[in-house]
UniProtKB/Swiss-Prot annotation:
This is NADH-ubiquinone oxidoreductase subunit 8. Belongs to the complex I 23 kDa subunit family. Core subunit of the mitochondrial membrane respiratory chain NADH dehydrogenase (Complex I) that is believed to belong to the minimal assembly required for catalysis. Complex I functions in the transfer of electrons from NADH to the respiratory chain. The immediate electron acceptor for the enzyme is believed to be ubiquinone. May donate electrons to ubiquinone. [4Fe-4S] cluster 1 binds at residues 63, 66, 69, 112. Its EC number is 7.1.1.2. It is an enzyme of class 7 (translocase). GO terms for biological process: mitochondrial electron transport, NADH to ubiquinone; mitochondrial respiratory chain complex I assembly. It catalyses: a ubiquinone + NADH + 5 H(+)(in) = a ubiquinol + NAD(+) + 4 H(+)(out). It is found in: Mitochondrion. Transmembrane segments: none annotated. GO terms for molecular function: 4 iron, 4 sulfur cluster binding; metal ion binding; NADH dehydrogenase (ubiquinone) activity. Keywords: 4Fe-4S, Electron transport, Iron, Iron-sulfur, Metal-binding, Mitochondrion, NAD, Oxidoreductase, Repeat, Respiratory chain, Translocase, Transport, Ubiquinone. Coiled coil: none annotated.
Length: 162
């Protein structure tokens, strides 16, 4: 760069003018910042949030106690106990997930042959105590009942890829 060019850039502050023009350009664009608890951004249909156990339309729980989710969980966060019913089918008597161990990988959801355990759209489940993050079967079924419409819609959208 010649001395004349350097002097011209310094004298006319071309770098400063370029920076200010960029700032003005962004100043008049649409804002992308959200005012988070009052505004919420879109979630991907593949978002993996709080776990839930689903039920059939009849109200019967879907889980058949195959224990595939427990076996595949890399964090060993799932504990299942089951017993056979009179009709020969198996159902869970205990289904616990330690959410402090869970790494939200989604392997349990992928392994489940009947779509019983899913990771729902809820990401706001902060608690004050550790015990509140130890989910039992009842808590998981409540989550499933609460988020069933969104979970079913997300699973239907992803059916081609499963």
């Amino acid at each position: 760069m010649t001395i004349i060019n350097k002097t011209a850039q310094t004298l006319f502050l071309t770098e400063l003018v370029k920076g200010m023009s960029l700032t003005l350009d962004y100043f008049f664009r649409k804002k992308v910042t959200l005012n988070y608890p009052f505004e919420k951004g879109p979630l991907s249909p593949r978002f993996r949030g709080e776990h839930a156990l689903r039920r059939y339309q009849t109200g019967e729980e879907r889980c058949i106690a195959c224990k595939l989710c427990e076996a595949i969980c890399p964090a060993q966060a799932i504990t299942i106990e089951s017993e056979p019913r009179i009709d020969g089918s198996r159902r869970t008597t205990r289904y616990d997930i330690d959410m402090t161990k869970c790494i939200y990988c989604g392997f349990c959801q992928e392994a489940c042959p009947v779509d019983a355990i899913v990771e729902g759209p809820n990401f706001e489940f902060a608690t004050e105590t550790h015990e509140e993050l130890l989910y039992d079967k009842e808590k998981l079924l409540q989550n499933g009942d609460r988020w069933e419409t969104e979970i079913a819609a997300n699973l239907a959208n992803e059916a081609l890829y499963r």
